[in-house]
């Protein structure tokens, strides 16, 4: 079997995208994710994303991590899937004006030229509304997303901490103790603020926290350093994928954690290894809004095993 695909990334958080509107195929998707993700022996990616017909919206996105596990949500992946779906006509008939919350966020983002269009996309975390900034040539240059309300109840993240909310909670590492805040943005995140970000041994500490017994579904891990009230630097270890260049839901979780800990204001720029994301935690509607790029790298055909 051959499978046509696109390689896309959001700030270096890259995935192989397969369009199941254009190709009516069935495959072992977890195994394909494991095959395409290695950078020496596959296409090279953080995982696999399927763009397919939705049950509750025109388009649905499914995400498989590099290890084959299925994820509920990926912010960078959603932006890329939204761009692909718009530019390939998959959102025709459902495009509309920006709803109130996204319109307010877009006004703050103040992008020059172009026009905004919105559409719903189905994910494992529910239906999310995307805002597409369309420029000359009907091309999407930036994508905003209404990421919804953060989940803060410990049991729903899920964690086994006894506290109702995990905010700046002590957490023991093999060589010391840190303060951790846990947030779900449709997937679970642990955020640790530190003034010594350059000293973090992410390859050692990341998997230790990811697989800790406190997190029954494992967890995404982020170390962050506040550079001011409106800017934060972030390093990410993703559940099922390891170190990545960026994590959209993780950046949203960092913005929320920074607000809960009193370190950050509502509007924040997150500095990630792959670039910058603009975030807004709007306390009026309790939604988190995200803006960032979605980049097409190349298209190809997979000839390997499935």
Per-region residue spans from a language model:
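Short, charged/polar, Gly/Pro-enriched secondary-structure boundary elements
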Residues: 151-155
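A glycine-rich beta-to-alpha transition motif near the start of alpha/beta enzyme domains, typified by
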Residues: 1-139, 190-306
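Short, solvent-exposed secondary-structure boundary/capping segments
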Residues: 138-147
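Selected transmembrane alpha-helices and immediately adjacent juxtamembrane segments
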Residues: 179-180, 188-191
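Active-site donor-nucleotide binding/catalytic segment of nucleotide-sugar enzymes
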Residues: 183-185, 290
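Glycine-centered secondary-structure boundary/capping sites
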Residues: 89, 156-158, 172, 262-263
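N-terminal, positively charged, Ser/Thr/Ala/Gly-biased leader segments
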Residues: 1-24, 145, 157-159, 163-183
